[in-house]
């Protein structure tokens, strides 16, 4: 326990919260270029082929970023926009590709939750 005199001299130090998305550098999104687009398998007990892109950001960080939705048009040298948000069953993947921004196409035939996948509103018949 600190004495009153010690507290007057030094004061209490605030504990700083560590960012879960350091590569964004306190920005909402960052632009980058895909260096590798690949699939990977999730941790147990899940089983799938998850689509992931290795992205080199404008601030020269290189991060793994998840490509959500069914199907995508990304390949090497595609320009993408990434946002924060980890994928729980993929270790080391702490970012998401924003669908419908830059070179990333939105998800075709998406009816629900369209804003999250860059899909336009379907035409009324």
UniProtKB/Swiss-Prot annotation:
Pfam families reported in the protein's UniProt record: Ribosom_S12_S23
Gene3D superfamilies to which the protein is assigned, alphabetical: Nucleic acid-binding proteins
GO molecular function: rRNA binding; structural constituent of ribosome; tRNA binding
Domain of life: Bacteria
Region (Disordered), start-end ranges: 1-23, 102-125
Compositional bias of kind Basic residues: 111-125
Keywords, alphabetical: Methylation, Ribonucleoprotein, Ribosomal protein, RNA-binding, rRNA-binding, tRNA-binding
Gene Ontology cellular-component terms listed: small ribosomal subunit
CDD domains per the UniProt record, alphabetical: Ribosomal_S12 (cd03368)
SUPFAM superfamilies given in the database record: Nucleic acid-binding proteins (SSF50249)
Positions of post-translational 3-methylthioaspartic acid modification: 89
PANTHER family referenced in this protein's UniProt entry, alphabetically: 30S RIBOSOMAL PROTEIN S12 FAMILY MEMBER
Quaternary structure and partners: Part of the 30S ribosomal subunit. Contacts proteins S8 and S17. May interact with IF1 in the 30S initiation complex.
Record-stated family: Belongs to the universal ribosomal protein uS12 family.
Designated name of the protein: Small ribosomal subunit protein uS12
């Amino acid at each position: 326990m600190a004495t009153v005199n010690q507290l007057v001299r030094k004061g209490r130090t605030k504990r700083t919260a560590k960012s879960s998305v350091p590569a964004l550098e306190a920005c909402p999104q960052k632009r980058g270029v895909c260096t590798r687009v690949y699939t990977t398998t999730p941790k147990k007990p899940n089983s799938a082929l998850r689509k992931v892109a290795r992205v080199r950001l404008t601030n020269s960080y290189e991060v793994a970023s998840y490509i959500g939705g069914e199907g995508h048009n990304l390949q090497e040298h595609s320009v993408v926009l990434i946002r924060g948000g980890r994928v729980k069953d993929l270790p080391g993947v702490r970012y998401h590709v924003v669908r419908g921004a830059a070179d990333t196409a939105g998800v075709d035939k998406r009816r629900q939750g369209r804003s999250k996948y860059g899909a336009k509103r379907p035409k009324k018949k």
